[in-house]
Design a protein with these regions (language model features):
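C-terminal motif of bacterial Sec signal peptides marking the signal peptidase cleavage site
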Residues: 20-23
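Bacterial signal peptide processing site
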Residues: 25-27
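A conserved helix-loop-strand patch within extracytoplasmic ligand-binding domains
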Residues: 29-38, 122, 141, 257-292
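Short, well-ordered beta-strand elements
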Residues: 30-39, 136, 185-198, 215-220, ...
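Short helices/loops that flank or line small-molecule/ion binding pockets
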Residues: 52-53, 69-84, 204-212, 225-239
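Short helix-initiation/N-cap motifs at beta->coil->alpha
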Residues: 63-74, 194-197, 218-230
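Periplasmic-binding protein-like
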Residues: 69, 92-142, 263-272
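A ligand-binding cleft/hinge motif common to bilobed small-molecule-binding domains
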Residues: 77-102, 240-255
């Protein structure tokens, strides 16, 4: 009888222990999810490419229109809360220095490969201001150089003052861009730009150099379509941020015969979908696995 009671107690203890093991075992971590892709202004080429990506990859998320500032604010909030988020992104951009980010792989090459950034002018700028045209041909910088200006602008949005400071710190490089005859006499140069951080950096550096040379400079921010059409119609002089051959391909197709692609000022640019490095997938093709 004692033996029988002992066996019963033993079985009860084993059952309790089994329940305890199950109850105290590590709970399965919930899978993080992603919501809609956070985009920028609807006229941007990257937004058209992202609309195409939604179709090509049959994505079960949407695309939110906004602005560069709204996109980076959303990214900042998500990272502060260690949340997963997908944004439209491009490099060069100061956010890559601020946070640990990664481009999602694009196996269908919707966003294309590497791009370059070019300065584009009205056709007769070379006749009216040949030295300004030559300066734009010479203007070229690398990731560290444009990144330094973008970092300054992100910390304190005094764009012209930051450009002037950067110029003083990089005088040898800048002097190599300036042709011997670059000397204005109060003539007005009109520069257009889109409100992208890389465009702000290059536009104000070029503007500051031309002001040093004696020109009056007017900078106007517009959307990409207006920027291209205005230069094609001769309503302004130039802009420094044509992303080619992909992002601004449609504009080049439409206006290419009526503008002058003066020269490349940056190589190795990239566009695509960007996530914090801690996000647990690496490809656009995997987004649906984590869509909420």
């Amino acid at each position: 009888m004692f033996k029988g009671k002992l066996m019963t107690v033993t079985l009860i203890l084993m059952a309790v222990l089994a329940l305890g093991i199950v109850g105290c075992g590590p709970a399965e971590e919930p899978t993080a999810t992603v919501g809609d892709i956070v985009g920028i202004d609807p006229g941007a080429g990257i937004m058209a490419a992202t609309e195409e990506a939604l179709e090509v990859y049959d994505l079960e998320v949407g695309l939110i229109e906004g602005s560069d500032a709204a996109m980076t604010a959303e990214l900042s909030t998500a990272i502060a809360n260690e949340e997963w988020v997908i944004v439209t992104g491009w490099a060069p951009h100061w956010k890559f220095a601020e946070w640990d980010l990664k481009f999602l792989e694009d196996p269908e090459l919707v966003y294309g490969g590497e791009e370059y950034i070019a300065s584009v002018s009205r056709l007769d700028l070379v006749d009216d201001y040949p030295d300004v045209h030559e300066f734009l041909q010479n203007f070229y910088w690398d990731d560290a150089e444009i990144g330094a200006v973008m970092d300054m602008n992100a910390e304190e949005p005094e764009f012209l003052a930051n450009a002037q400071t950067w110029i003083e710190d990089n005088r040898d490089l800048v002097d190599g861009w300036i042709p011997e005859g670059l000397e204005g006499d109060g003539e007005t140069i009109e520069i257009l730009m889109v409100e992208w951080d890389c465009a702000t950096a290059s536009t104000y550096v070029v503007s500051a150099i031309l002001q040093e040379a004696g020109y009056e400079v007017e900078v106007t921010a517009v959307d990409a379509g207006v920027m291209w059409s205005s230069i094609a119609e001769g309503d302004a002089d130039f802009f420094t941020t044509a992303w080619l051959p992909g992002t601004h391909e449609a504009y080049m197709d439409e206006f290419g015969d009526d503008v002058d692609e003066v020269g490349t000022n940056y190589e190795g640019a990239q566009i695509g979908l960007v996530v914090p490095a801690y996000v647990g997938f690496d490809s656009i093709a995997e987004i649906n696995d984590y869509a909420d």
